[in-house]
Regions:
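Outer-membrane beta-barrel channels and translocator barrels
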Residues: 78-80, 90, 129-133, 173-178, ...
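Outer membrane beta-barrel transmembrane domains
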Residues: 50-52, 98, 105-109, 198, ...
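Residue-level detector of the transmembrane beta-barrel scaffold of outer-membrane proteins
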Residues: 38-42, 82-84, 134-138, 179-185, ...
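Transmembrane beta-barrel architecture of outer-membrane proteins
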Residues: 36, 66-72, 117-121, 160-164, ...
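Outer-membrane pore/translocation modules
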Residues: 92-200, 242-253, 320
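Transmembrane beta-strands of outer-membrane beta-barrel pores
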Residues: 43-49, 58, 87-93, 128, ...
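Residues on the lipid-exposed face of transmembrane beta-strands in outer-membrane beta-barrel proteins
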Residues: 41-43, 71-75, 85, 122-126, ...
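Outer-membrane beta-barrel biogenesis signature
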Residues: 21-63, 300-320
Length: 320
């Protein structure tokens, strides 16, 4: 089914914005069949000029820029159960006159390019309903991969453990809207406490796509986040205070992101995609905009192993 790989553009959209604006995980209701895998690789550029304060005011603190190399692997353990792992590699640079200065650590906001792996994301999904409305609950964990700097205008991430649960929903909109589908995801994330402070979040993601042809699809994307607890910037963490040293980790980041994209199926196993997006409104965040391009390759590991050993593929049970 074409929708099974329709979430590729959204995967790159949210994986990247999560680094700069703490956006949610991608909405992927459809899973690969048993024994099949999909590998996604994307490149992304994000930039921002303004911080958005607790009351929505814009604060110009210099130019922030990120480049991401995003990799993601999903494997269908059964027709209804899949696992996913991914990690981004981040290049970033801050150009401005207001660098963050960590206590006892080198300054990251020095006008130079810095790079690091960000966080591992490990996820398990189970397709509980497979009728006209697909429902896929999931559990995920985020683990920092290294000791990267988190106090920076262009930090790679928040360097926190996170545990999330939720459900993805998907439905074809035929016959009302032929060749059109919709996906949505609702999730709740528990983040590692800092200074004993809770700062959990709810996310809602929506994707609506339409196939112009069997190979070409266009889509609109939306992502909302509401953080419960945390710091109002700069009220609760003024410059020079102890709280300022962890204000990026504890920011009460709430935002709405809007995007649009197009994808092209080169063949039955290879997709290309491109997406543009922008933070439309936010509190305690950055006014990020960006563009991403990516490719997804679907394959069967078992068949690849058999080919390497010179064995013929096993016939399908449905084969004549």
């Amino acid at each position: 089914m074409r929708e099974k790989r329709s979430g590729t553009a959204f995967l790159f959209l949210v994986a990247g914005i999560e680094l700069a604006a703490a956006a949610p995980a991608s909405a992927q209701a459809w899973l690969p069949p048993k024994g099949e895998a999909s590998f996604s690789l994307g490149g992304q550029n994000l930039n921002a000029r303004y911080h958005l304060l607790w009351d929505g005011r814009r604060d110009d603190r210099g130019k922030m820029e990120w480049y991401h190399a995003i990799s993601d692997l999903t494997y269908g353990v059964t027709d209804r159960f899949a696992v996913r792992v991914g990690i981004p590699y981040v290049f970033s640079r801050y150009a401005g006159n207001f660098p963050h200065r960590p206590v006892g650590r080198p300054v990251h906001d020095d006008g130079q390019w810095h790079s690091t792996f960000q966080d591992f994301r490990i996820e398990a999904r189970y397709m509980a309903a497979t009728g006209s409305l697909v429902a896929t609950p999931f559990l995920s964990i985020v683990l920092p991969s290294s000791g990267y700097e988190f106090l920076s205008h262009v930090a790679a991430g928040r360097h926190l453990r996170e545990y999330a649960g939720g459900v993805s929903l998907g439905r074809r909109l035929d016959p009302v809207l032929p060749d059109t589908y919709a996906q949505a995801q609702l999730s709740f994330t528990m983040a590692q406490r800092v200074l004993g402070i809770w700062h959990n979040k709810n996310n809602a993601d929506v994707e609506v796509g339409h196939f112009l042809s069997p190979s070409v699809a266009v889509r609109m994307l939306g992502a909302w986040q509401w953080t419960h607890g945390g710091f109002r910037i700069p009220l609760d963490a003024p410059a020079g205070s102890a709280n300022f040293q962890v204000h990026d980790q504890l920011a009460k980041d709430s935002h709405f992101i809007l995007g649009g994209g197009v994808s092209y199926a080169v063949n039955g196993s290879l997709d290309l995609s491109a997406t543009v997006f922008k933070v439309m409104t936010a509190r305690n965040s950055n006014e990020v905009r960006g563009i991403s391009v990516g490719t997804t390759w679907g394959f069967s590991p078992a068949q690849m192993i058999r080919r390497r050993k010179g064995a013929a593929p096993t016939a399908s049970p449905d084969a004549p």
